[in-house]
């Protein structure tokens, strides 16, 4: 593997900021050295949300958003470099996931679209950039997601302990790590996405800090049962999903025809949906000795408490306790995937995505050579 300093850039489905990490990576280690979270302007956030929820968009608007996000990602990287005192010449490459605006891995013409012009990122930072990671897996018949389980396997596989790594971002996904067995992983369903969208609508807050709003509500059993009957939860892996499926429109359809439910009770019910849909899948894959949680949902005490209650006998903790910052897991993963791409090594796991073979992921955007 080509060792060096890499930067990972991740803007996830939760839209809570652009996460940027600096890591020293070689064949055996991934050592995080710095982190920075760059704010996403509200107008860009609203444009992304509109596209993800199927609103009509012109090619001009899509192209301009692609450009603006590329500039935003470059600004985030340059800020990290300024804060660390590093120069572009000291960085081997950037792994830039891009912003997913559509993910449709099934049907006649499976597709996934991440925007944020990597040409701009490379040009503005002066650093070789690797992006467009998902579509190569899709080309080999895979879901294109999740891709992070390969990184979980590299960092968190235990020689004897059966583990599940659970990322609760906008969407929740798990990685089953069993010594001596192929990695399994897939999206379980909503993570923070519906919770964040609902509290934004009713309280104009980006997220429910410490679950204080949900704690004051009471889960509604009728709504919960209706949500859990959604066909996605019964699909067999490999499977993946996103904001284009689980969004406020989906929630409104679930609420339609039910007696009025107080907004904070809906929030409490959404916590139950996230926790139960995750716990059901943990048990479906045979459980584990330790559930390692990362992502924004790891900071939600109500989700964590419900997972512990729903999974007796399983130790529920965070990846931080294993030395991996859970807030930066995905950005670190794409820095690591960039190192594999530059080294000509595969980054996907067919046992996770359903692809017909392992493959090198992504496209390389080199800087000019003097």
From Swiss-Prot:
GO molecular function, one term: kinase activity
Pathway: Amino-sugar metabolism; 1,6-anhydro-N-acetylmuramate degradation; Cell wall biogenesis; peptidoglycan recycling
E.C. designation(s): 2.7.1.170
Claim: Nucleotide-binding is one of the keywords in the record: yes
Domain of life from the UniProt record: Bacteria
GO BP field: 1,6-anhydro-N-acetyl-beta-muramic acid catabolic process; amino sugar metabolic process; peptidoglycan turnover
Annotated binding of ATP, by residue: 12-19
InterPro entries: Anhydro_N_Ac-Mur_kinase, ATPase_NBD
UniProt-listed Pfam families: AnmK
Enzyme category, top tier: transferase
Keywords for this protein: ATP-binding, Carbohydrate metabolism, Kinase, Nucleotide-binding, Transferase
NCBIfam families reported in the protein's UniProt record: PRK09585.1-1, PRK09585.1-3
Summary of the function given for this chain in its UniProt record: Catalyzes the specific phosphorylation of 1,6-anhydro-N-acetylmuramic acid (anhMurNAc) with the simultaneous cleavage of the 1,6-anhydro ring, generating MurNAc-6-P. Is required for the utilization of anhMurNAc either imported from the medium or derived from its own cell wall murein, and thus plays a role in cell wall recycling.
Recorded family membership: Belongs to the anhydro-N-acetylmuramic acid kinase family.
Name of the molecule in the record: Anhydro-N-acetylmuramic acid kinase
Organism: Pectobacterium atrosepticum (strain SCRI 1043 / ATCC BAA-672) (Erwinia carotovora subsp. atroseptica)
Lineage: Bacteria, Pseudomonadati, Pseudomonadota, Gammaproteobacteria, Enterobacterales
UniProt gene name: anmK
